Amino acid sequence: MSSKVHLGHTARKRFGQNFLTDDNVINRIVGAIAPDNDHVMVEIGPGLGALTEPVATAIDNLTVVELDRDLVERLQNHPVLKDKLTIHQGDALQFDFSQLVVPGKKLKVFGNLPYNISTPLMFHLFEFAEQIETMHFMLQKEVVLRLSASPGNKAYGRLTVMAQYFCQVVPVLEVPPHSFAPPPKVDSAVVRLLPYAEKPFPCKDVNVLRQLCTTAFNMRRKTLRNNLKQVLSDAEFEQLGIDPNLRPEQISVEQYVAMANMVCDKQA
């Protein structure tokens, strides 16, 4: 049988499907997620249920968002899970997660994310950060390194700044390719994202911060002065105490927020 077939389902490349099969890893992830009935538990991309089954067993109801119609049908007919699940068939990148919030309950979101959409999905989820208590995701190890990077690190970029603006980022464990069927060509890792109740560096307009980061990191090897010359003058960099000769990966989240807030003040 092809290595792409697992539990009778053929992994679909266009959906980025690699199914988690290592029980030890599954148990550790479920322990990190800490399922409970005090939150709305939400799984993105339940796949064949490696995380779905142990999480659903521990709680009264689990909401899942799954794009693959074949997998949705399997879940709807699952002898154990069908009565525990609220299933939304659709694209998580387009999904309005705020509709899942109920009074007095924030979301706990988790999933073994398709690696081909993980970065845009992170940006989408940050828009709902105020409604989310915790997020636990299996990602390409390289993406976890980007999420958790420090200034000056080559992995530090736009995703880093936006993730650390919204959340505390905690790498949880590394997962080798043989823990999946079929094995991916890259190493994986689990990350915990804890949205801030109060942001350490509040931004006056997060859209300005997002655009500033996009512009700054568009040409990583060039200086801030070069990349942001249409946005901030040398005098304004000096006022902020930021050296415009530095490269974008050398600037902290706090400094990016300070620059964005200055842009907001100029636009007011």
Curated annotation (Swiss-Prot):
An annotated Gene Ontology molecular function: 16S rRNA (adenine(1518)-N(6)/adenine(1519)-N(6))-dimethyltransferase activity
PROSITE patterns: RRNA_A_DIMETH, SAM_RNA_A_N6_MT
Pfam families (UniProt xref): RrnaAD (PF00398)
Positions that bind S-adenosyl-L-methionine: N18, L20, G45, E66, D91, N112
Predominant place of localization: cytoplasm
Presence of keyword Lyase: no
Keywords of the record: Cytoplasm, Methyltransferase, RNA-binding, rRNA processing, S-adenosyl-L-methionine, Transferase
Record bears the keyword Ribosomal protein: no
Cystines in this chain: none
GO cellular component entries: cytosol
Subcellular location: Cytoplasm
EC number(s) per entry: 2.1.1.182
Catalytic activity annotation: adenosine(1518)/adenosine(1519) in 16S rRNA + 4 S-adenosyl-L-methionine = N(6)-dimethyladenosine(1518)/N(6)-dimethyladenosine(1519) in 16S rRNA + 4 S-adenosyl-L-homocysteine + 4 H(+)
InterPro entries cross-referenced by the UniProt entry: KsgA/Erm, rRNA_Ade_diMease-like_C, rRNA_Ade_Mease_Trfase_CS, rRNA_Ade_methylase_Trfase_N, rRNA_adenine_dimethylase, SAM-dependent_MTases_sf
Function: Specifically dimethylates two adjacent adenosines (A1518 and A1519) in the loop of a conserved hairpin near the 3'-end of 16S rRNA in the 30S particle. May play a critical role in biogenesis of 30S subunits.
Family assignment from sequence similarity: Belongs to the class I-like SAM-binding methyltransferase superfamily. rRNA adenine N(6)-methyltransferase family. RsmA subfamily.
Protein name, per record: Ribosomal RNA small subunit methyltransferase A
The organism of origin for this protein: Shewanella sp. (strain MR-4)
